[in-house]
Amino acid sequence: MTRESINIGGRRSKLAVVQSNHVRDLVQAKFPQYDCTVFTLQTLGDQIQFKPLYSFGGKALWTKELEDYLYCEDQEKRLDLIVHSLKDMPTLLPDGFELGCVTKRVDPTDCIVMPRGSPHRCLADLPEGAVVGTSSVRRSAQLKRKFPHLKYQSVRGNIHTRLEKLDDPEGPFQCLVLASAGLVRMGLEDRITQRLHSDIMYHAVGQGALGIEIRQGDKKILQILDEIADLESTVCCLAERSLMRTLEGGCSVPIGVESSYDHKTKKLLLKGIVVNVEGTMAIEDQQEVVVNDIREDSIKCGVLLAHKMIKDGAKKILDEINLERVIQQ
């Protein structure tokens, strides 16, 4: 008797393959009757390595090519689900697609990585004019507020490529800012010099979580994903994505968040910050909601916080950022 198969898609980078294999293992452990196969594809974001993400607006850079295969006419090539770093998923998906689930989140913080042998242990140790490598305007904008004496330069490439650039004695960087989760998943946690908590930097929407994208209304796959979803991660990430969607920001716009959910009290706390590119203006606020309906109340929390922040001037900052991006293009 032929075993039924589930085709899992993801990007080709080493980190993406680790993440896709992790989801495959989660599904296989719960549903041993299925054959789970991982397929990898190159996306537009993988192909364009010479321009900063900020100049693209960040929407669908990592998802479009994979989405096409969810509706592929060739059944052998057709994907049943796609594994994304949730922070790379647009908050508004095209018709015919939906976020099927969020798996358990890994450390959502950003971190500082110093070159091997560096005497410096934190950002505050770095001398004036030291160059910090980051591909994210959210990161550089927030750090400019706290460390205006440092310089910030775009760095692209996968984790190993960035670390090679950092460790090169002839390279320009005195440190890198990376997502802690990526290093943890790649077995490189020992490279983390300093974790950046919210007193220094709010993390990206969905950072550290995996989002599983599926065909809209695919009941069979939804039932499978229900078994590997994580409640706390789902609640927090739905709220974070709702905040970003309401503020109309793409994944490279400087919106930072921090969220927590208490299972006993059902209280969800969402904090958010919007910073201009120069790091000279910031709107920061928070919202608490009791979650009775997981989807409805989590989304409501993000909407309420967004409206607070818009009232305080966040929209003005975001409009200026979007105008600057159009001029650069």
UniProtKB/Swiss-Prot annotation:
Name this protein carries in UniProt: Porphobilinogen deaminase
EC numbers, comma separated: 2.5.1.61
InterPro entries: HemC (IPR000860), Porphobilin_deaminase_cofac_BS (IPR022419), Porphobilin_deaminase_N (IPR022417), Porphobilinogen_deaminase_C (IPR022418), Porphobilinogen_deaminase_C_sf (IPR036803)
Alphabetically ordered keywords of this record: Heme biosynthesis, Porphyrin biosynthesis, Transferase
UniProt modified residues of type S-(dipyrrolylmethanemethyl)cysteine: C251
GO terms of biological process kind: protoporphyrinogen IX biosynthetic process
Entry-linked SUPFAM superfamilies: Periplasmic binding protein-like II (SSF53850), Porphobilinogen deaminase (hydroxymethylbilane synthase), C-terminal domain (SSF54782)
Pathway: Porphyrin-containing compound metabolism; protoporphyrin-IX biosynthesis; coproporphyrinogen-III from 5-aminolevulinate: step 2/4
Catalysed reactions listed for this entry: 4 porphobilinogen + H2O = hydroxymethylbilane + 4 NH4(+)
Cofactor note: Binds 1 dipyrromethane group covalently.
Cofactors demanded by this protein: dipyrromethane
Any one of the GO CC terms: cytoplasm
